[in-house]
């Protein structure tokens, strides 16, 4: 019941937002048009706080490390097919969880009877891996067809981690290049600092909570980059528009006006994402827990804060608007 309510609220907000964008209903205004929060006053606190949190996150990473999942530690991979019909994932998870094999992940793919099983590497070499596979076969019985059985070693897992890290770095570089061409180099640098800030703090969160770091975590980090960039670009686009219109407005006032004018959109977006992630976090099960927990922290808690209190005020320190000259353009009635 709770899951249905949360998902229903998220869908309702999305529908209202789309209808308002296309003019079917009046534009949604979560905050009044004359809102004038002085966000730039907080930059004297946000930058030192973020610097301290970043140092703490890096320290936690080197002290505690990450709790690597099967994808990066190695282990066993079994592809099975239920002969009698659709596979019961919950039943299979209970059966395999009682074998004492450590981390066991199940994923349905292809048809409803196909299941991919990942089991953590067992201490004791190849003999221990084969013994674990035999335990699984005995537990699942004769009604299962084993279509693939593989043992993934540390070398392959290390390559996956390296490829994931390279992919993350290439995404950040791609974002930098994109913003450099769309805006100015100061905007690109500000967005890159904000994105790196989000990723570092999220990795620190994963280190302190010791939730599994696997391929879904890499996907979560890339998604966080996308959400953070999207929010930042919306604010930057409004800043660029106001820079062209108001040649004499002080930079702090201009940044405040830009953030205030996009505040309704930011609130609606993040409330919708929060409701969807909350439903997944509470009812999605263990299989996607790492992904949803990481997203909840990175998008909802860190991403929103970064776009407003890091990415925007960073432009002041990078000298954006310092060389403006001319008269303000008249505002259309």
Per-region residue spans from a language model:
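A structural signal for conserved, well-ordered secondary-structure elements
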Residues: 1-333
């Amino acid at each position: 019941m709770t899951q249905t309510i949360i998902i229903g609220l998220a869908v309702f907000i999305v529908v209202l937002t789309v209808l308002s964008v296309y003019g079917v209903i009046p534009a949604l205004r979560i905050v009044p048009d004359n809102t004038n929060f002085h966000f730039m006053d907080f930059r004297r606190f946000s930058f030192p706080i973020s610097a301290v949190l970043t140092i703490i996150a890096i320290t936690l990473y080197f002290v505690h490390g990450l709790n690597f999942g099967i994808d990066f530690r190695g282990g066993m991979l079994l592809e099975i097919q239920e002969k009698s019909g659709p596979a019961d994932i919950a039943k299979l998870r209970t059966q395999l969880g009682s074998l004492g094999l450590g981390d066991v992940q199940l994923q349905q793919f292809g048809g409803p009877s196909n299941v991919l099983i990942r089991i953590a590497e067992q201490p004791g070499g190849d003999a221990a891996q084969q013994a674990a596979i035999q335990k699984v076969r005995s537990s699942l019985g004769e009604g299962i067809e084993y279509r693939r059985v593989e043992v993934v070693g540390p070398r392959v897992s290390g390559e996956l981690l390296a490829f994931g890290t390279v992919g993350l770095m290439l995404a950040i570089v791609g974002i930098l290049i994109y913003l450099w061409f769309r805006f100015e180099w100061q905007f690109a640098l500000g967005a890159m600092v904000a994105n790196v800030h989000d990723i570092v703090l999220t990795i620190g969160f994963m280190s302190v909570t010791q939730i599994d770091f696997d391929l879904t975590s890499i996907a979560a980090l890339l998604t966080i980059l996308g959400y953070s960039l999207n929010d930042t670009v919306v604010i930057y686009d409004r800043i660029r528009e106001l820079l062209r219109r108001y040649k004499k407005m002080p930079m702090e006032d201009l940044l405040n006006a830009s953030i205030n004018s996009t505040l309704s959109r930011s609130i609606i977006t993040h409330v919708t994402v929060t409701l969807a992630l909350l439903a997944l976090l509470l009812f999605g099960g263990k299989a996607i827990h790492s992904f949803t927990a990481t997203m909840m922290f990175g998008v909802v808690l860190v991403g929103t804060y970064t776009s407003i209190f890091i990415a925007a005020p960073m432009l002041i320190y990078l000298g954006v608007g310092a060389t403006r000259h001319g008269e303000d353009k008249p505002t259309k009635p």
